[in-house]
Amino acid sequence: MLKGRNLLDPMDFSLEELEEVFKLADEIIEEPEKFLHVCDGKILATLFYEPSTRTRFSFEAAMLRLGGQVIGFSEPNSSSVAKGESVADTIRTVGCYADIAAMRHPKEGAPAIAAMYSEIPVINAGDGSHQHPTQTLTDLLTIRSLKGDLSNLTIGCCGDLKFGRTVHSLVKALSRYKNNKFVFMSPEELKIPDYIRKEILEKNNIEYKEVSKMEDAMAELDILYMTRVQRERFFNEDDYVRLKDSYILDGEKMRYAKKDMMVLHPLPRVNEIAYEIDQDPRGCYFKQAKYGMYVRMALIAKLLGVR
């Protein structure tokens, strides 16, 4: 049972519990009308201390499609955070009004602190460059739905692997499934963090390699997970400008790829995927965004215990 639980890290749920969520998402996709009122009388609080389009909108759409309601803020200046209120006090107060909360915060660990003080389930909607577990659930559901399995895959992660919380969460999650391998493609300055390399991959004897050119790895990939270089994580604009065009996926590079490779991206896109790829059936990032709403519907229903 997931009722009353928090989701702060992709490792919080067992593989069996993840499969519970995915099976419910499958049911929602097949017969959405059956779920129109399962959250009648329930309220989701969206506490977004950082800008968001897909994550916030998909949480809100998920709750509304389940028959629930939404309260919250989309940037801290519109709340008492601007007056200096702590995360702990904010979540205690919100818990008086809402049944479940989704929090995005620029500081790593802020949702975990909120969960310590909360009487309602807390979902980490992204904390700094740390974790983004609901994006990971989105990615896993997308792969599971379109590939049929989450094992025996070669996954390429490309772009900002240092600050990319979606990549960190995805590698942690996919490392739990059998016979998955990873290829990391990034500038030297944006390499995958040591804690992922040592504590997740090497500790569990998971095969991985790092390459400097996309073309060197494209032919072996089942999944290519693209990320943008994140301007908001840089203190020096010159560094951002120098690195932002490091890896761009275009039609020429796609010639090296398998016919059934999937291109995923957590979005927003800047320039790292050429628009011509939108017409390629291997470009699955907008399907991925839709799966995000369904998996969040399933997650909310499970944590509230209404399904």
Swiss-Prot record:
Q: Which domain of life is it from?
A: Bacteria
InterPro entries (alphabetical)? Asp/Orn_carbamoyltranf_P-bd, Asp/Orn_carbamoylTrfase, Asp/Orn_carbamoylTrfase_sf, Asp_carbamoyltransf, Asp_carbamoyltransf_Asp/Orn-bd
Protein name per Swiss-Prot or TrEMBL: Aspartate carbamoyltransferase catalytic subunit
Q: Which UniProt keywords apply?
A: Pyrimidine biosynthesis, Transferase
The record's PANTHER family line, in alphabetical order, gives: ASPARTATE CARBAMOYLTRANSFERASE, ORNITHINE CARBAMOYLTRANSFERASE, MITOCHONDRIAL
Record's catalysed reaction(s): carbamoyl phosphate + L-aspartate = N-carbamoyl-L-aspartate + phosphate + H(+)
Q: Which residues form a coiled coil?
A: none
**GO MF annotation terms:** amino acid binding; aspartate carbamoyltransferase activity
Q: Does the keyword Secreted apply?
A: no
Its GO biological process terms? 'de novo' pyrimidine nucleobase biosynthetic process; 'de novo' UMP biosynthetic process; amino acid metabolic process
Query: EC no.?
Result: 2.1.3.2
Which Gene3D superfamilies does this entry report, sorted A to Z? Aspartate/ornithine carbamoyltransferase
Q: Which residues bind carbamoyl phosphate?
A: 54-55, 104, 132, 135, 267-268
Which pathway is recorded for this entry? Pyrimidine metabolism; UMP biosynthesis via de novo pathway; (S)-dihydroorotate from bicarbonate: step 2/3
Q: From which lineage does this chain's organism come? A: Bacteria, Bacillati, Bacillota, Clostridia, Eubacteriales
- PROSITE patterns per record: CARBAMOYLTRANSFERASE
Write down the species.
Clostridium botulinum (strain Okra / Type B1)
- Residues given in the record as L-aspartate binding sites: 83, 165, 228
> Which gene is the coding source of this polypeptide chain?
pyrB
Does the keyword Metal-binding feature in the UniProt annotation? Answer: no
